Curated annotation (Swiss-Prot):
Biased composition (Basic and acidic residues): 439-465
Classification via Pfam families: Na_H_Exchanger, TrkA_N
Gene3D superfamilies cross-referenced by the UniProt entry: 1.20.1530.20, NAD(P)-binding Rossmann-like Domain
Role description: Electroneutral K(+)/H(+) efflux antiporter involved in chloroplastic K(+) homeostasis and osmotic adjustment, especially during plastid division and thylakoid membrane formation. Collaboratively with KEA2, adjusts alkaline stromal pH upon light to dark transitions in plastids. Together with KEA2, critical for chloroplast development, including chloroplast RNA-metabolism (e.g. rRNA maturation, polysome loading and RNA-protein interactions) and plastid gene expression (PGE), ion homeostasis, and photosynthesis.
Family: Belongs to the monovalent cation:proton antiporter 2 (CPA2) transporter (TC 2.A.37) family. KEA (TC 2.A.37.1) subfamily.
Compositionally skewed regions (Polar residues) per UniProt: 351-364
Residue span of region Disordered: 103-135, 351-372, 421-474, 1165-1184
Localization annotation: Plastid, Chloroplast inner membrane
Gene transcribed to yield this protein: KEA1
PTM text: Acetylated at Lys-168 by the stromal acetyltransferase enzyme NSI.
A single Gene Ontology CC term: extracellular region
Organism ancestry: Eukaryota, Viridiplantae, Streptophyta, Embryophyta, Tracheophyta
Protein's recorded name: K(+) efflux antiporter 1, chloroplastic
pH dependence remark: Optimum pH is 5.8.
Tissue: Expressed in shoots and roots. Mainly localized to leaf veins, hypocotyls, mesophylls and guard cells. Accumulates at high levels in small and dividing plastids (at protein level).
Length: 1193
């Protein structure tokens, strides 16, 4: 058979089941290097202690990449120490240390020689050890490079092998499909022949009836003839009658003769008819026999073809398994290449780290020598300068500096002469010319420079290798904050533009806003300094004395007092302006204007900061104009009440983007991970507050539960800005936040019951149980009413309003639904945001969700920004300065502690360590409900106002740093997750909460565009690719891209193919496309498959393999070019649109039917319900052509 070809495994030591390969206990290379898997150290045959220690720093264990290593390829290319190694001696006198200003430390020649020999011997030994270690490290690097090169070759072979098997699988599958079609055709022929036989049998029956009828007719004709003959014979036997009787008898005889002739004719006709019927019957019988024989032949042929088709199906299954194994070997080869690259990078880093101290030590010794020389020179220069000052007149013609500059070269020359004298004497004594000795000195002095330059070049070469995946283009994905490469703040000597330069340019463009912001800041500092009175001591500094060579001055006034001089003049000018009293309405208007002004100034500025977010801008604006800043906002409580609706609209928008099915798939993390996070964090923080901080039991309970909550508004906003809402950590974070919104109800019910002012006199478990039971009943009734009313009333109400075509009424109805459900849940004891979330979840099932989302977008943005500003208003900078260590310590414990707890909990629930860290960093800050809980605790006498103020500040600052914590999580993922290919493999626990998602098979050009469109609409998807580089690019963009074979049943199961609604197959190779479609149609037939076809023939084969719809990859570019050409030919736009649409419809009939059923065109032209009406062909008015000849349709 064609598919019965084999491929060999790499020559490795098998270390277990599957495809894991590892070292044996000991491998001995032919050149004396032994590698031990226990401690993974390289020991040279010379057994030099320093060399062994240095080889330990090299860590060849890095080469044992994750238990997999090539065994037969390890060998040493050269010995660790060269055979003819010659140590270079450093001539005596080069490193003599000078004592005094001009003395050089004279000694007799014997002492010089003894010192020279001992020093040179030590340096020779150290040089030998160093060279041995360097050569050993170099050998190891060469071995690793050779291993990497062989791994790359094996990867190329594996890729060719997998491509070959995929092509064979496609050919065998197409042959099987052809045999199946042929068998179907054969059975169709059999059935047709059987139908003909049935018709023949029917005709035979008719013919038999005709024969019987003809036979009966012949019998009747013969009977009539016999009667006539008998009557004639009877008439001839009578006597002769009279004349009249004779005449009558003659007439009778004539009639009988005529009847006899007619009877004979009838007999002939019946005989002819009978003969015809018998001939037809015989023909039908012969035809029937022939047809039966043909049926037997066709049946036998069809059975043969059917058997061949079944065998072909088995062959297809076998070749698909072989192709899957080939792709699996390709993936393993990719992993080995990745492991080899990591091992090589680590080895090079360890080598560079081990060589850096030696170079720095040599550079330090050179610097010490140069410093001694400089000290001698400086001493001589000072003496000469002193003499010149004495000898020169007071108003000399030349300045002292110029005279000194002229005398320095002479001193240097004298110093060089004194230094070269020992060289010359020693060289002449040894019989060597002085020129050679000077060359040796120059060569030794230039060695460190060359080594440093070569190492810098090597490290610069290594940097692109490590950061290639992270430096991939990310501009195609619309995300607000990304990470910057190492060259972000570096300046290019060639004068090319850098990111830092562009940042400076943007600051220059925004200088009016900066000036206005600084003016507001200065005014705020002025008002603050004037208002604090005696509290200015916080800004004062102790007396600082600054001395210089000219004078001594002391400054005792802080900077704020110097700034106060300017505002006094401004105050005088303001007093001259007539004032007018401001009423409450104008005050509210001024508050609104200040809020808008601050947001317009600070939000763009903070977006320019690396890793910045609009949330930070709103928080900074709130701090500045809040009661603890400039105190510009007068009605803070009213502002906070209105700002709460920002969270309400945010949760409503989140509900619109979800569905009931997707929410049900998240129940494991909502009620599992969410409850575990809240309970464990509350318990740990409460115990710390009680036993460490000495807080009372009720206060510890409130503190633990309040700090266990996180900010739903901040976290979801940051996730949306970064485009991470559909990522693994984004989904897990949202699940926990959803449960926290439910847990707030319990906390707010619990606070009055544990208050010392309560009528129960403390904690009463019966009262708590009764209150919680009543709250649960109220919540259940409210949620049931919202769900039932929404399912029954929302769709007909919105349909009726949509028929009126009034946008204002539509928006008003949306606001009514949001505020009504929020009020209902608030009256039931739940949060307002939860009611809005339920309303959005119900509206998401209707066809009006997109319009509703666009209507509430302006309200959501403004109110959410207002909410963040109110959070900033709660931050007290004065309190931060006075309690800085306590607040920073508490903040650090909160962030680190909650992150560790969430990581542990997330790992228990099957989340990867990197995703769990990112979830922990997002949920570590406090939340907005902590303000409500702590405020209620103060009102109930559970905690003091001072403690609540400190906690307010900690929670506010933690919410402010949430964007940077999210950026830190992405940095951790980019540093630790992207290096190892195994971390990119699909895990079932990473996708078990997905429902109705999209599977993208292939993350190339087409797959990336589809992923971008889905990500912008927050539609959940999972992408697969066998290229680790593409997967790394996707992961660096926080997209759910996994390294795996899209044609494997196990991989498809791990990404939740059974719960997916559709799959897009956009692989490069036609064979891989076919194999993926085959696997999806066989194992997951309910998943609709949309495939990218290479050409029409390939598309037909894919349709036969089970593809739902096939899109030729050349169709859309051809249509775009054709539209441009038709537009250039002066055809009207309507005619071009109709032509292109008709052509597309003919070639995409199946896709068009699906689009019409869903009510949209999915990007493939106009739907039939919205075709443009034909317009008069006016070439000047209808053709809308942009630059380049493309058409705007």
């Amino acid at each position: 058979m064609e598919y019965a070809s084999t491929f060999q495994r790499p020559i490795l030591f098998h270390g277990g089941d599957g495809a894991s390969y590892c070292f044996p206990n000991r491998l001995i290379s032919p050149k004396g290097i032994s590698i031990t898997s226990g401690d993974s150290k390289v020991h040279s045959c010379f057994r030099l202690r320093r060399n062994v220690a240095q080889s330990g720093t090299l860590n060849l264990m890095n080469a044992c990449f994750s238990g997999r290593f090539y065994s037969g390829h390890l060998h040493s290319t050269k010995s660790i120490l060269g055979n003819g190694h010659q140590a270079k001696r450093i001539p005596f006198g080069f490193r003599l240390r000078c004592q005094g200003h001009e003395s050089l430390g004279n000694a007799d020649s014997n002492d010089h020689r003894i010192g020279e020999s001992s020093e040179s011997s030590d340096e020779t030994e150290a040089t030998d050890l160093k060279d041995a270690r360097v050569e050993n490290d170099t050998d190891s690097l060469e071995e690793l490079k050779e291993l990497l090169h062989k791994a790359i070759k094996e990867l190329e072979v594996a890729r060719l092998n997998s491509t070959m098997f995929e092509e064979k699988a496609q050919r065998i599958s197409e042959r099987a499909i052809a045999l199946k079609d042929e068998a179907a055709t054969a059975w169709l022929d059999v059935n047709k022949t059987l139908d003909v036989i049935r018709d023949t049998v029917y005709e035979e029956a008719l013919a038999k009836e005709a024969v019987q009828t003809a036979t009966m007719a012949l019998s009747l004709a013969e009977a009539r003839l016999q009667v006539i003959v008998e009557s004639l014979e009877a008439g001839a036997g009578n006597d002769i009658p009279h004349v009249s009787e004779e005449t009558e008898e003659t007439i009778d005889v004539n009639d009988k003769e005529e009847a006899l002739l007619a009877a004979k004719d009838d007999i002939k006709e019946c005989q002819v008819n009978l003969d015809n019927c018998e001939s037809q019957l015989s023909a039908l019988l012969s035809k029937k026999d022939e047809l039966q024989k043909e049926v037997d032949k066709l049946n036998e042929f069809a059975e043969t073809i059917q058997i061949s088709s079944l065998k072909a199906e088995e062959d297809v299954t076998n070749i698909m398994k072989l192709a899957e194994q080939a792709v699996a070997f390709e993936l393993e080869a990719t992993q080995r290449v990745n492991d080899a690259e990591i091992a090589l990078q680590r080895a090079e880093k360890s080598l560079s780290i081990s060589q850096t101290p030696e170079e720095t030590q040599g550079q330090l010794s050179d610097e010490e020598t140069s410093q001694e020389d400089a000290m001698v020179l400086s001493g001589n220069v000072e003496d000469v300068t002193h003499q010149v000052e004495k000898e020169s007149p007071k108003d000399g013609d030349l300045p002292v500096v110029q005279i000194t500059a002229e005398l320095v070269p002479d001193i240097v020359g004298q110093r060089n002469k004194k230094l070269t004298q020992p060289y010359e004497s020693s060289d002449h004594e040894n019989g060597k010319p002085s020129v050679e000795s000077s060359k040796v000195v120059e060569a030794d002095s230039e060695k460190p420079k060359i080594n440093v330059q070569t190492k810098k070049q090597e490290t610069q070469k290594d940097l692109p290798k490590e950061g290639s995946s992270l430096n991939s283009p990310k501009a195609s994905f619309n995300k607000s904050s990304r990470f910057f490469s190492a060259s972000f703040f570096s300046s290019n000597p060639d004068g090319t533009a850098t990111v830092f330069g562009s940042l400076v340019g943007s600051v220059k463009q925004q200088w009016p806003k900066l000036v206005l912001g600084l003016a507001l800041l200065g005014a705020g500092l002025t008002l603050y300094s004037n208002g604090v009175g005696g509290n200015n001591q916080l800004l004062q500094q102790p007396d600082v004395t600054s001395t210089s060579t000219e004078d001594v001055s002391s400054s005792t006034k802080p900077l704020i007092r110097q700034v106060q001089k300017l505002p006094k003049r401004i105050k005088k000018l303001l007093e001259m302006i007539p004032h007018q009293e401001v009423n409450e309405e104008e005050a509210s208007l001024f508050d609104f204007l200040w809020l808008l002004l601050a947001s317009v100034i600070f939000v763009p500025l903070f977006q320019k900061i690396p890793g910045g977010s609009p949330v930070l801008g709103y928080l900074a604006a709130g701090i500045l104009i809040g009661p603890y800043g400039l105190s510009i906002i007068r009605n803070v409580h009213g502002t906070r009440a209105i700002a709460e609706f920002g969270v309400v609209f945010l949760l409503f928008n989140i509900g619109l983007e979800l569905s009931v099915e997707r929410l049900s798939s998240m129940k494991k993390y909502v009620f599992g991970l969410g409850s575990a996070q809240v309970l464990v964090t509350a318990a740990v923080v409460g115990l710390l507050a009680h036993y460490v901080a000495g807080q009372a039991g009720p206060a510890a309970i409130v503190i633990g539960n309040g700090l266990a909550l996180s900010s739903t508004a901040v976290v979801l906003q940051v996730l949306q800005e970064r485009g991470e809402s559909t990522s693994r950590h984004g989904r897990a974070s949202f699940s926990v936040l959803l449960f926290q919104d439910l847990a707030v109800v319990v906390l707010l019910i619990l606070i009055p019951l544990i208050s010392p002012n309560s009528s129960k006199g403390g904690i009463g478990f019966q009262a708590i149980a009764e209150a919680l039971g009543l709250a649960a009943v109220k919540a259940a009734v409210a949620i049931t009413a919202i769900i039932a009313g929404g399912r029954l009333l929302l769709r007909p109400i919105y349909k009726q309003i949509a028929e009126n075509r009034n946008a204002e009424i539509f928006s008003a109805n949306t606001l009514l639904v949001i505020l009504g459900t929020s009020l209902l849940t608030a009256r039931a004891g739940l949060s307002m945001a939860l009611g809005a979330f339920l309303a959005g979840l119900l509206l998401a099932e209707t066809e009006f969700s997109l319009q509703v989302e666009s209507d509430i977008a302006p309200y959501r943005g403004l109110l959410l920004g207002l909410f963040f500003m109110t959070v900033g208003m709660s931050i007290d900078p004065k309190l931060l300065l006075s309690n800085f260590p306590v607040i920073v310590g508490t903040l650090g414990l909160l962030i680190v502690g909650k992150t560790m707890l969430v990581v542990i909990m997330g790992k228990l629930f099957g989340i990867s360590i990197i995703s769990a860290i990112r979830v922990g960093l997002l949920l570590a800050p406090g939340g907005e409900f902590a303000f409500v809980a702590f405020g209620e605790a103060v009102n109930q006498g559970i905690m003091s106002p001072q403690l609540s103020s400190l906690l307010f500040l900690v929670v506010g600052i933690s919410m402010a740093i949430t964007p940077w914590l999210a950026a830190g999580g992405q940095l951790i993922a980019s540093r630790f997750e992207l290096h190892d290919v195994r971390s990119l493999l699909p895990v079932e626990s990473e996708t078990d909460d997905l429902q109705g998602h999209i599977i993208i098979c292939g993350f190339g050009r087409v797959g990336q565009i589809i992923a971008q469109l889905l990500s912008e609409r927050l539609i959940p998807f999972v992408a697969l690719d066998v290229s680790s580089d593409r997967v790394t690019i996707g992961r660096s963009l926080d997209l759910p891209v996994y390294f795996g074979d899209a044609g494997s049943k196990e991989v498809l199961h791990k990404i939740g193919a059974g719960r997916a609604c559709a799959a897009v197959v956009a692989l490069d190779a036609p064979g891989a496309n076919y194999r993926c479609v085959w696997a999806l149609s066989k194992f997951y037939p309910n998943v609709k498959t949309f495939v990218r076809a290479h050409d029409v023939v390939h598309g037909l084969n894919l349709e036969k393999a089970g593809a739902t719809a096939v899109v030729p990859e050349t169709l859309e570019p051809s249509l775009q070019l054709a539209a441009a050409v038709l537009a250039q030919a002066k055809l009207p736009t309507s005619e071009i649109a109709n032509t292109i649409n008709e052509f597309r419809t003919r070639h995409l009939s199946e896709l068009t039917e699906l689009c019409e059923a869903s009510g949209s065109s999915l990007g493939y032209g106009y739907s039939r319900t919205s075709k443009p009406k034909p317009q008069p062909s006016d070439a000047s008015g209808d053709n809308q052509i942009i630059e380049g000849g493309t058409v705007v349709i």
